[in-house]
């Protein structure tokens, strides 16, 4: 496969991120050799100094950093723009308030350069990520040691068992750029939680992957108004439903893809469906209880097989307990998980 000049493109969707962008971009430029790294800062119609800061980085690092300005399209629209503009053989999305670990960056670049020079480069690299929550001393590191053997070329059928709360999020993913484009993924604009789609729709086009057991990505939690705060997610349950609908329609039938891929996609779809259900229940709003029912009815109408397989999952069964008892179980279960994991 022909070697491109850029090994890795980082896409940074940025809206009003003037206070955080310097930390993010600086971490991406901490590599010993940045010649084959590309950093695209997609300013999504910011109202602060985000664009000006991105342009300063572009002037300071010509040929490496590029500032892209667009009218506001939301997180998904900014990711779409970045992927379309990417020149790297591989692409990774880094939110502007997050950052990467410098030592892990060196390891990642070593692996990707080797793959870029090979005749059959992997389609996806999976790395660990850290929930970096404000005020929490012990940071929760998400790894995939139980499901993936580190350092080896893997296919979907080589993967082990993913536990109830184990899944591959955007923070863990580096895709081969061509794979994302071939998948035809276009994230919904002006919609939150499209990260679920990003870590799902391209997977049927991924044939080979590697797992690097290093804490590459730091996921910052604690910024006011952040989309993963409980009250915010409750207000945005309609967007969680939209994301669920997109994921359902990106799910292949079981006889069209490797067994390992189908099992994982059902596992992750069950988790997203469960997350959406949790926040509909946490709202204590009867209208949202009805929306929860409508969401599950939509899955069943689209594919009875996918619906049956998703409902088999333990978390999904628990979330579909009827009446006030079921709602009580979910409310209590969420807050226990929140305390242990530091998700929110």
Feature annotation, model-predicted:
Residues 17-30:
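Short, well-formed alpha-helical segments that are part of the catalytic scaffolds
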Residues 27, 43-52, 74:
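A conserved acidic beta->alpha catalytic loop
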Residues 36-45, 66-71, 96:
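Short beta-strand/loop segment that forms part of the nucleotide-sugar
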Residues 70-86:
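Glycine-rich, basic loop-to-helix element that forms the pyrophosphate-binding segment
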Residues 75, 99-209, 221, 225-233:
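Donor-binding/catalytic cores of nucleotide-activated saccharide
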Residues 91:
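Short aromatic/hydrophobic "clamp" motif used to bind/position activated sugar donors
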Residues 191, 208-243, 283-290:
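Nucleotide-sugar-dependent glycosyltransferase catalytic core
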Residues 282-344:
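Membrane-interface aromatic/basic loop that binds lipid-linked glycans or pyrophosphate carriers
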